[in-house]
Amino acid sequence: MLRKYEAMFILDQDTQDVNALSSRMIEIISKDGKVIEKNDLGLIEFAYKINHKKKGHYFVVIVEATAEAIKEFERIANIEKNVVRTLIINTENEQGYEQSVQLSKTDMTKFEEERKAKRDFKKPFVKKEFNKPTEKRTFEKPAEVTVEVKEVVVEEVKQTVKPAKKVAEAKVEEVSHEEAHDFVSKMEAKYKAHLAETVEEHVEEVEVEEAKTTAKKPAAPKMSAAERAKVDGSHNIDEERYELQKYSNKLRSVAIEKNLPKKLQEVNLRDLTKKELIEYMRKVRAALAK
């Protein structure tokens, strides 16, 4: 449904192609509608700086437009860095509206001047008189009360610390080297359809090749572990993540002990998905088998 709108937008004073950008903004807001009247007010000085700039190119346009076109205009205005201000009014809601781009209700120059005038107002200084206290009163806390409070606090701390140690001890669970190897074999057999057919054996060569590729191509934005888990098939793995990380921790300690390639020693296991943890364990086992 077409409605009548009056829109004002200001372009940055340093915009390279003012005509092209203003035409694009007017074309967006008038899509599936029509332009009734428009006016280029030119380069006008602001009442106060906007984005550290003193001037801007003002444009006023009266259009019949759809709600979708208005939303798209506002979206592009938020993205385009050279559009510094926008203001849109629905003329059907304005009482006594007079259609004119010369007497535009969206022209913010008067509004800015009023704001600037208000800033010049200074609140009169009123000196307050404070009565000086005639005497200072000191409150002495009874020694017995202080001792009792300290004893209670110490006892509470002791009671709180003890169960915390038990919880920490309960969480520690060690696995052997052999158990880790058996677990990897079990995962390979169970998820054969979701894992890579072969494991990279020459890790150092892969690192060198990746370094060359990285130097030639710009770095792509890195996905988080949660984002990668949605696309790499981790949802097909039934085991809990803490169980996979438990065996991965063991194999990483073996990789450090056997001085395997740094890529296997310095990996951040917390940043790996379920599938990536299984692939990591396969790589460590393959490196140990050399």
Curated annotation (Swiss-Prot):
- Gene3D superfamilies, from UniProt? 3.30.70.60
List keywords of the entry alphabetically: Ribonucleoprotein, Ribosomal protein, RNA-binding, rRNA-binding
GO CC, sorted alphabetically, is: cytoplasm; ribonucleoprotein complex; ribosome
Q: Does the keyword Ribonucleoprotein apply?
A: yes
Where in this protein does the record put region Disordered?
Answer: 208-233
A GO molecular-function annotation = structural constituent of ribosome
Entry's Pfam families?
Ribosomal_S6 (PF01250)
By its UniProt entry, which SUPFAM superfamilies does this protein fall under?
A: Ribosomal protein S6
Might you name a Gene Ontology BP term for this protein?
Answer: translation
What family name appears in the similarity comment? Answer: Belongs to the bacterial ribosomal protein bS6 family.
State what this protein does: Binds together with bS18 to 16S ribosomal RNA.
> Which protein is depicted?
Small ribosomal subunit protein bS6
The encoding gene? rpsF
